[in-house]
Amino acid sequence: MNKVVLLCRPGFEKECAAEITDKAGKREIFGFARVKENAGYVIYECYQPEDGEKLISELPFSSLIFARQWFVVGELLQHLPPEDRITPIVGMLQGVVEKGGELRVEVADTNESKELMKFCRKFTVPLRAALRDVGVLTNYETPKRPVVHVFFIAPGCCYTGYSFAHNNSPFYMGIPRLKFPSDAPSRSTLKLEEALHVFIPEDEWDERLANGMYAVDLGACPGGWTYQLVKRNMWVYSVDNGPMAQSLMDTGQVTWLREDGFRYRPNRNNISWMVCDMVEKPAKVTALMAQWLVNGWCRETIFNLKLPMKKRYEEVSHNLAYLQAQLDEHGVNAQIQARQLYHDREEVTVHVRRLWAAVGGRRDER
């Protein structure tokens, strides 16, 4: 199995292809990407037969920016007979996967695939039963075993394969299913909520998103991102010349600071979180984020970088490299992750967690 399917946002196939080609090449896993515009997926075909599995096991999925999900697959199954689609799929998976822990029958995230999605939902139940009968799936779902993927690209046409549960997206189609809260001031609130689900392990939420923490929201108006912090019982400094939603001010947890997010400097030294969703050039936002992290003004940050029309992967890579260089230069040890989220549009979301100062004798306790 030498092909890897990567699901992505429709319209960002070229960026997804450029990224996987670059990062696979750095691990000496060579191949080429098959790209179809607005298809919502990319196929990276490795030159060596076993390199597909090697790629999805060795390259951390969390290091990918434009992929929502990935899995290794074999050849395309075509012209599945409508009276029995199950037998050929079972045949393709037998001997390839043993005791998979979960089945996901998926499609790309496009308008054309919506009808196909209805079929996938109905088809999952009988296919799961058949795969359990032959030992491709365990009798009960388990997160400790590989995930079996059946990916339909058209009626009667699908790829079959698997991903590793410790190195994939835990979400169906790589998309967390979030509901817009009716009392939130703007739909942008879903961007931050999704970022928290993607970047922070669930078992660390109580510690890293704790009641009573102090947070700063730069460019906060009208308060979509502030809403998420307030919901987690944090005290929030919302920085923006524009007004905040009255519903947030009424909580008593929000201090509205009417000033420019680029000029604001915090006057406390116990800020756990800084979040930022400002419409500005990526380089300017990245420089501001580097300043906050280098000075220890916050422990963790989530921010958005708005993308240009062309060379979007190169632009993101350049800004992340600049941020890493600034942290290295000032002896700050940090984890950096970036992802184009489902609720992002022409942008990517970046999460940085400051761990400790790497300089001997210094420890970051702020």
UniProtKB/Swiss-Prot annotation:
<dbReference type="InterPro" id="IPR011224">
    <property type="entry name" value="rRNA_MeTrfase_M"/>
</dbReference>
<feature type="active site" description="Proton acceptor">
    <location>
        <position position="306"/>
    </location>
</feature>
<feature type="binding site">
    <location>
        <begin position="221"/>
        <end position="224"/>
    </location>
    <ligand>
        <name>S-adenosyl-L-methionine</name>
    </ligand>
</feature>
<feature type="binding site">
    <location>
        <position position="240"/>
    </location>
    <ligand>
        <name>S-adenosyl-L-methionine</name>
    </ligand>
</feature>
<comment type="similarity">
    <text>Belongs to the class I-like SAM-binding methyltransferase superfamily. RNA methyltransferase RlmE family. RlmM subfamily.</text>
</comment>
<feature type="binding site">
    <location>
        <position position="277"/>
    </location>
    <ligand>
        <name>S-adenosyl-L-methionine</name>
    </ligand>
</feature>
<protein>
    <recommendedName>
        <fullName>Ribosomal RNA large subunit methyltransferase M</fullName>
        <ecNumber>2.1.1.186</ecNumber>
    </recommendedName>
</protein>
<dbReference type="GO" id="GO:0008757">
    <property type="term" value="F:S-adenosylmethionine-dependent methyltransferase activity"/>
</dbReference>
<keyword id="KW-0489">Methyltransferase</keyword>
<dbReference type="InterPro" id="IPR040739">
    <property type="entry name" value="RlmM_FDX"/>
</dbReference>
<dbReference type="InterPro" id="IPR048646">
    <property type="entry name" value="RlmM_THUMP-like"/>
</dbReference>
<keyword id="KW-0963">Cytoplasm</keyword>
<keyword id="KW-0949">S-adenosyl-L-methionine</keyword>
<dbReference type="Pfam" id="PF01728">
    <property type="entry name" value="FtsJ"/>
</dbReference>
<dbReference type="InterPro" id="IPR002877">
    <property type="entry name" value="RNA_MeTrfase_FtsJ_dom"/>
</dbReference>
<dbReference type="Pfam" id="PF18125">
    <property type="entry name" value="RlmM_FDX"/>
</dbReference>
<dbReference type="InterPro" id="IPR029063">
    <property type="entry name" value="SAM-dependent_MTases_sf"/>
</dbReference>
<dbReference type="GO" id="GO:0005737">
    <property type="term" value="C:cytoplasm"/>
</dbReference>
<dbReference type="GO" id="GO:0032259">
    <property type="term" value="P:methylation"/>
</dbReference>
<dbReference type="Pfam" id="PF21239">
    <property type="entry name" value="RLMM_N"/>
</dbReference>
<keyword id="KW-0808">Transferase</keyword>
<comment type="subunit">
    <text>Monomer.</text>
</comment>
<dbReference type="GO" id="GO:0006364">
    <property type="term" value="P:rRNA processing"/>
</dbReference>
<feature type="binding site">
    <location>
        <position position="260"/>
    </location>
    <ligand>
        <name>S-adenosyl-L-methionine</name>
    </ligand>
</feature>
<keyword id="KW-0698">rRNA processing</keyword>
<comment type="function">
    <text>Catalyzes the 2'-O-methylation at nucleotide C2498 in 23S rRNA.</text>
</comment>
<feature type="binding site">
    <location>
        <position position="188"/>
    </location>
    <ligand>
        <name>S-adenosyl-L-methionine</name>
    </ligand>
</feature>
